Amino acid sequence: MKEKVVSLAQDLIRRPSISPNDEGCQQIIAERLEKLGFQIEWMPFNDTLNLWAKHGTSEPVIAFAGHTDVVPTGDENQWSSPPFSAEIIDGMLYGRGAADMKGSLAAMIVAAEEYVKANPNHKGTIALLITSDEEATAKDGTIHVVETLMARDEKITYCMVGEPSSAKNLGDVVKNGRRGSITGNLYIQGIQGHVAYPHLAENPIHKAALFLQELTTYQWDKGNEFFPPTSLQIANIHAGTGSNNVIPAELYIQFNLRYCTEVTDEIIKQKVAEMLEKHNLKYRIEWNLSGKPFLTKPGKLLDSITSAIEETIGITPKAETGGGTSDGRFIALMGAEVVEFGPLNSTIHKVNECVSVEDLGKCGEIYHKMLVNLLDS
C-alpha cells in the first residue's frame, strides 16, 4: 500500500494548486475512483472546485474529507528542493502540501480503493468530499457541499478528515473536536485634531486603553473536560495618519477568540458590547463567525480510529480539541461524528514541508483498518 500512497501523493504535489486553484488534482482522483464504480459529482462554486464521490447506497455513510489546495510556498530559493517537485530525500517526501494535506489525501483514496476492490458489495456507503478552498476563505468549498447535501436530505454518519493531527509521533493525537472561531473588527471613533491642542480633539487610542485592558484580561471560562479555556488575541491594530502631530480620528482593532462550548458567539458579542458601553466609547463593530465549536464524544468512530492506530503502530492516541479550525466544523452541522487524523504537523505551511514516506504508508493502513472496523463489525 505504501508505494501506491506515495506515488499518488507525488502526482498531487507536482500540481501547484495554490488556493483556491485545483490544477487538475481532483480530476486525477475522480478518474481513479470512477474506474471502481464510484459515482462522481462535481460541485463547482465560483472559482472553487469540489468533488463528491460515493460507492454504495445505504447507511452508514462513511466519508473521507480533504482538500487539494495548498498555501503559497514563500521564497522558493529557501527550499532544499523545488516545492512542487515532490522529491524523496532520506525517506522524507518534500513539497508544498506533503503534510497538509496531499499526503493523507492520497492515503485516504488508496485505502478506499483497496477496501472497495476487496469488498465490491460492501454494506453502507464510502464517500469522499474534496475541495480546493480550505486554506483561503473556505467560503466556496466544503460548506457549500454540505449545504447541498443537507438540502436533498443526504447524510454523513461518520467523517474522517485527513488533517495532519499528529504532534511528535504518527498517531499520538487525533482531533475529536475544534474550538469555535469568531473575529471582531472594531472601529472606535474619536475627533481628529492637532496634538498641541488636545482639548479640541478626542484621542480614540487614549479612550480605548482601559477597554483594551479589560478585553485582554477577561476570563471567559475555564474550559471543560473536552476543551481548553476560551482565548482572545488582538491580531491587528491601527490608527493615525502617519504624522506625529495629528491626533487620529479613528482606532481600528481586530481581535479573534477561539472559544469552547462553555460560551456561545452571542454571549461573546453581548459581553464585548457591555465592555464598550461601560467605557463610554463611540464605536461600530463587525463580527465574522468562522465556525462554531463541535465535539465528537467517545463512540463508534473514535473507537474505530483508535483501534486502527493501536493495531498498526502500537500506540493509543490522545483525543484533543486544540489548534485552529478545519472543515470538520461544516461537516459536523450534518450531525455526523467527525474525527481528524493525519501525519505530523511540524512542517505544515513552512519552507521544506515534508512527511515521512513510512508514515504515509501507515496512514493508508490505518484508514483502511478504520473502514474494516466500521463496516465489517
UniProtKB/Swiss-Prot annotation:
Give details on activation and inhibition. Answer: Competitively inhibited by L,L-DAP, D,L-DAP, 2-carboxyethylphosphonic acid (CEPA) and 5-mercaptopentanoic acid (MSPA). Succinate is a poor inhibitor.
Read off the CDD domains from this record.
Answer: M20_DapE_proteobac (cd03891)
- Give the record's keywords alphabetically: Amino-acid biosynthesis, Cobalt, Diaminopimelate biosynthesis, Hydrolase, Lysine biosynthesis, Metal-binding, Zinc
Q: Binding positions for Zn(2+) 2?
A: 100, 135, 349
GO terms in the biological process aspect are: diaminopimelate biosynthetic process; lysine biosynthetic process via diaminopimelate
Task: Tell me a GO cellular component.
Answer: cytosol
**Name this protein carries in UniProt:** Succinyl-diaminopimelate desuccinylase
- Gene name tied to this protein: dapE
